Amino acid sequence: MVDNRNATLSHTDIDSDADFGADASSAQPSPPGGSGTATHSQALAVLRELVGNAGADFHDGQYEAIEALVDGGRRTLVVQRTGWGKSAVYFVASLLLRRRGAGPTLIVSPLLALMRDQVAAAARAGVRAVAINSANQLEWDTVREQLAADQVDVLLVSPERLTNPSFRENQLPELIRRTGLLVIDEAHCISDWGHDFRPDYRRIADLIEQLPGSVPVLATTATANSRVVHDIEEQLGAGVLTIRGALGRDSLRLGVLTLPDARQRLGWLLTHLSDLPGSGIIYTLTVSAAEDTARLLAEAGHEVLSYTGRTDPADRERAEQLLKDNQVKALVATSALGMGFDKPDLGFVVHLGAPSSPVAYYQQVGRAGRGAANADVLLLPGSEDRDIWQYFATASMPSEEKAAAVLTALAEAGSAVSTVALEARVDLRRTPLELLLKVLSVDGAVERVGGGWRSTRRPWVYDAERYQRIAEARVDEQDSMIIYQDTAGCRMEYITSVLDDETAHACGRCDNCAGQWFPADVAADATNAAGQTLSRAGGVLEARLQWPSGMDRLGVPVKGKIKPPEALSEGRVLARLTDLGWGGALRTIFAAGAEDRPVDPAMLQACVKVLREWGTGDSRTAGWSGGGRPAAIVSIPSRSKPQLVDSLARGISDIGRIPYLGALQLAHGGPTGSRGGNSAYRLAGVWDRVVVGPELEAALNSIQGQSVMLIDDLADSRWTLTVAGRALRQAGAGAVLPLVLAQAG
């Protein structure tokens, strides 16, 4: 039986203590029955130590949760807006429980950055907090010693630790025996209905079952609709106390500005970024968009940095600190700048393209205005957003066919198989394979052991109906973002209603409630500058250096490093499919069902410009990647775009006055497989299927070992290029220099 209560928040002007509690002058009274008790007095004293404010008091609902944990030993779910102070609940409860003789609190959190911040925050209140995660392995022994000596009040671990065999066998049993409070941070990750589902979180349900019934459990999240809340409640067990607060953010002023194209959107940023309040975040949908936008703004004199999944961890931490210290105007970021980043005075969030779900959007805009009375939030949607959502839409659930293949491969192996070795037996890329293994592990079909994974031989039934419903829910979320852009009603009310907030109401501040608050003009010089950035073409196409492991199992006689005499040189690509500039035109060309036609003259000229710059070289590499000007051009035949490839090769040949020797030949029916398979299977699918024919071999002999330019339309795994380059080199070509129109990703 679920005890479901709604706690309405106090919406007040809050200071830098907003993440923990409110100033006494603005706080709501503590719940009846709590104020005046010994627990309340003790909890309030700890809160004030935590925030360093002798006048601080609880936000509405905070003490109710603390009391449920400390006095009631309850299993409690807190769903409250960002900045409400969920961490204050578990830090205060932890210290009170420790004073009553309980063991240390175990906090499961997916966020390394948040762990750093929380350890520092806990220390301010005398809470001895330590962490075990992938970033501090050198400290693990010290942490174990501190735990053994009972010198730790709070231990933070990543969910991945719970699946580590050594941790599970050597540390977890003792932790379970001694734990005084279990905290599940970002609990929406536990639900496969959630926008950020992580299979490792499903291990927590097993952990909860192993805890003594007297140990309280707290789950916290800011982003959960009713379906996700119900899923979390089921996994917490019976008798859950759910405290749901209002999700509306009075400090945020929302708006949507629809502009004709990417050039205008970037031009708007160039024109108006300096007028936005304080410092903030500009979110983009792709890595290339973040990097291009940051470069454009920096060249115009704005203090900005890019922040993506490709950013070095040390550079990420530095960028976060610069933003916190207001040393930059903005970070131009992908969703890599995610949960756990906290800057109470963040002045604005601008989205250059819409996230694919209202939940993700709410979470990202919720980083603004946590400790300020006002913050601006503006969405600049793009016509290409849905295409990008679709491009990145990867199934977070296992397909029945792939799951069966993994289970069969592990059962046949008999012993543990590493993920790398499994790639040679199952056609799945590393990331989806690891995700599938985690799902199967949580369901008990496989287990992670020393040396890799092995089958438990327990029966496993594929829940096709559930996975289909989840896939449909993802599409509904995308549709909701389109509705958000087009709605004439209050934008905050719409977002919070989608999150099933029963208290959703008109904010009176957004562009639909109070009128357009943002300028819509774009300076002509800014538009021109943006256009120049978008028209830039050319990126490095890195060559494969090593063959995948286990190729002998697939009948391909290669292993280890690719031999230099057979290797492809570094190449060039016009653009990635996700680029803001040429990416749009390329996505149209390669869209499903798109007609094959000769290369557009403007695209051909852009490729020629890329070649000129490649031939000149730069400080990093010599011209033509050190291979010398190509003496001939060869193309890879395309079954779907033959006119495109042939016209591109002939056009470059005519303009560059480089002989076009023709195309390679497809043998045995040509490459097999489809985009998305893993590296080993992709290589096996092209091996010996792209060959040098007799006429081409004779023509290659005539250039006497000089370099060859290799033309292709689309690069994904790069194994077709690698095999084609190897064949050309074995036939007598010197360096093989690939030029590709588009690269996936």
Residue ranges and their predicted role:
Residues 514, 529, 533, 722-745:
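PRPP-dependent phosphoribosyltransferase catalytic core
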Residues 92, 96, 231, 647, ...:
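Active-site signature of alpha/beta-hydrolase-fold catalytic machinery across serine-
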Residues 2-63:
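Pre-P-loop entry segment of helicase/translocase ATPase cores
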Residues 287, 311, 637-644:
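Acidic, metal-coordinating catalytic cores used for nucleic-acid/nucleotide bond scission
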Residues 328, 350, 354-363, 369-570:
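C-terminal accessory region of SF2 helicases/translocases
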Residues 367-374, 655-656, 729-733:
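Arginine/glycine-rich "motif VI" loop of SF2 helicases in the C-terminal RecA-like domain
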Residues 252, 531-632, 642, 646, ...:
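Active-site-facing substrate-recognition patch
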Residues 36-41, 45-50, 60, 64-89, ...:
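Helicase motor core with emphasis on the C-terminal RecA-like subdomain
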